[in-house]
Amino acid sequence: MISRRLKVALAVTLFLAFSSGLAWAQMASKMDADSAAIKQCVAAWEDAWNRHDAHATAGAYVEDGEFSSTTGVPSHGSKELEAHYNEIFTTFLKDAHRTDTVRSIRFLTPEIASVDIDWQMTGARTRDGKDAPNRKGLLTWVVTKQHSGQWMITIYHESAF
């Protein structure tokens, strides 16, 4: 016959196992939803970039967002970001098209994630107007979840291979 103490211990163990499993399932479901929302953020940014819409491209960043190009040129804050995108979209990247593919998403906290994105670009020109070779590289973004639930770019670093 099983003692009362053993029955209570088994009941508590089963309850804790079920509760933690349920909590894990809920957390995994939330992470899946957030991963999908982050991928949507990447897709919306890529779409704005390919339309050469400086305002919408910069609008994917938080107000004090930070950008660093493949050459190390930084832009900080909404006004600088929009000016940067306006300049490249009206000059050497005015005919460029890019493809961005999310490689990985790593949640640092429930509201902060690091995102690695493989990118490819065609149609670029050199600064003196000559056709540039196709390019590819890696973007590393830090994205943050806003109070609205929207994910936005906080830090953007770009490297070319």
Model-inferred region functions:
Residues 50, 121-127, 143:
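Beta-strand elements of well-folded, non-transmembrane domains
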Residues 9-21:
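Bacterial N-terminal signal peptides
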Residues 135-161:
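Short beta-strand edge/turn micro-motifs at domain boundaries
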Residues 45, 51-53:
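Short helix-adjacent coil turns
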Residues 32-41, 54-111, 116-118, 133-134:
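A solvent-exposed, acidic/Ser-Thr-rich amphipathic alpha-helical stretch
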Residues 23-25:
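Boundary at the C-terminal end of the N-terminal hydrophobic targeting segment
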Residues 127-133:
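A short acidic/glycine-rich loop-to-helix N-cap element
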Residues 1-11:
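Bacterial N-terminal signal peptides that target proteins for export
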